[in-house]
Curated annotation (Swiss-Prot):
The lineage of its organism: Viruses, Riboviria, Orthornavirae, Pisuviricota, Pisoniviricetes. It is found in: Host Golgi apparatus membrane. The gene is E. This is Envelope small membrane protein. The chain crosses the membrane at residues 19-39. Keywords: Apoptosis, Host Golgi apparatus, Host membrane, Membrane, Transmembrane, Transmembrane helix.
């Protein structure tokens, strides 16, 4: 009778250990997947920042420089004060 109780207690202990190990593995998997999803989201946001902020800024800067150079080429010469 005592041996049957000991085997049952050992079996319950082993099953408990298996459940504990599976739970820890699931928890670690969830944490790793959450970290990777966060990392992927950050990379996507950086790409969106490049598309929405950096590229238009470079475009506006280049167009402004082109207009400035064009204006300097076509503006009339400055009159001297004596000629006015």
């Amino acid at each position: 009778m005592f041996m049957a109780d000991a085997y049952l207690a050992d079996t319950v202990w082993y099953v408990g250990q298996i459940i504990f190990i599976v739970a820890i593995c699931l928890l670690v998997t969830i944490v790793v997947v959450a970290f990777l999803a966060t990392f992927k989201l950050c990379i996507q946001l950086c790409g969106m920042c490049n598309t929405l902020v950096l590229s238009p800024s470079i475009y506006v800067f280049n167009r402004g420089r082109q207009f400035y150079e064009f204006y300097n080429d076509v503006k009339p010469p400055v009159l001297d004060v004596d000629d006015v």
